[in-house]
Swiss-Prot record:
Its EC number is 1.7.1.13. Pathway: tRNA modification; tRNA-queuosine biosynthesis. It comes from Acinetobacter baumannii (strain SDF). The keyword Nuclease does not apply. This is NADPH-dependent 7-cyano-7-deazaguanine reductase. Homodimer. It is found in: Cytoplasm. The active site is at C177, D184. It catalyses: 7-aminomethyl-7-carbaguanine + 2 NADP(+) = 7-cyano-7-deazaguanine + 2 NADPH + 3 H(+). GO terms for molecular function: preQ1 synthase activity. Keywords: Cytoplasm, NADP, Oxidoreductase, Queuosine biosynthesis.
Length: 270
């Protein structure tokens, strides 16, 4: 199904009964065609935090929780966010014999839409704590030039030629939803092993996404691919934590080496 057929940007009725067929899969293949040769594009996970989860227990009493969805980057499909919101709303008045039964139902439905095994972890509403970013923040640097759209030629190696392993982050990631043009805000983490990158050039490159139209997952994969091709690291991780919209936040992570897979976190802006 094409993105244009999705419910994004359209007025919709919120379902009041269980409706798994509202889930809208979007194939990853088309946006990955030009990156097919790059190691790590399909390695990683998409973590979603779902803050508006509710269902009825066996006695008809509402239950609430915060959920973390784990979707493998190797899945053939991602799931469009508004359809996921509508799906969880459809469970608000549905009775389940147990919390485990609720989890199993959600995992079954999301796995069918994604085309791969999806996991759901539930947290009590007070249990999902925020973390502080680790690494070097590059936001106070001064880029040599700025561009309005993603430009991989901005990426440069440091003149020192030094070999390093470093984790950098920036809170200045901004892109637009490709359907509604609404802004998406995020913090991006880049863990890098190889010849030292020019940090100012990395910041300029991140800033160049500010008017780019792309889903969260696609932006992270483009950042990963451009750094991999232009800076040629030995190992690379790109992980973005996007702010919440409609009760959901999306956090894609791509790694060239599975030993570099981080644990999912939640930042203050989420």
């Amino acid at each position: 199904m094409s993105v244009e057929q999705s419910l994004l940007g359209k007025e919709t009725q919120y379902p009041t009964s269980y409706q798994p067929d509202v889930l809208f899969p979007i194939a990853r293949a088309q946006s990955r065609e030009k990156y097919a040769h790059i190691q790590g594009i399909t390695q990683g996970k998409d973590w979603w935090h779902v803050f508006e989860i509710s269902w009825l227990n066996a006695h008809g009493i509402p239950q609430v929780a915060i959920g973390r969805i784990t979707l493998p980057a190797s899945s053939p499909n991602l799931i469009e966010s508004k359809s996921l919101k509508l799906y969880f709303n459809s469970l608000n008045f549905t009775q389940f014999d147990s919390t485990q039964s609720f989890i199993e139902t959600v995992e079954k439905d999301l796995s069918a839409a994604a085309g791969a095994k999806v996991e759901l972890t539930l947290f009590q509403v007070d249990d999902l704590e925020t973390s502080k970013p680790q690494g070097i923040c590059i936001d106070d640097l001064m880029p040599e030039r700025l561009e309005q759209h993603p430009d991989a030629t901005l990426l440069k190696l440091d003149e020192s030629g030094e070999e390093i392993e470093v984790e950098l982050y920036s809170h200045l990631l901004r892109s637009n939803c490709p359907v509604t043009s609404q802004p998406d805000w995020g913090t991006v983490f880049i863990r890098f092993k190889g010849k030292k990158p020019c940090y100012r050039s990395l910041l300029a490159y991140i800033i160049s996404y500010r008017q780019h139209n792309g889903f969260h997952e696609q932006c992270v994969e483009q950042i990963f691919a451009d750094i991999w091709q232009n800076l040629q690291p030995e190992k690379l991780m790109v992980y973005a934590t996007y702010t919440r919209r409609g009760g959901l936040d999306i956090n894609p992570c791509r790694v060239s080496d599975l030993t570099w897979m981080p644990k999912p976190i939640r930042l203050a802006r989420q």
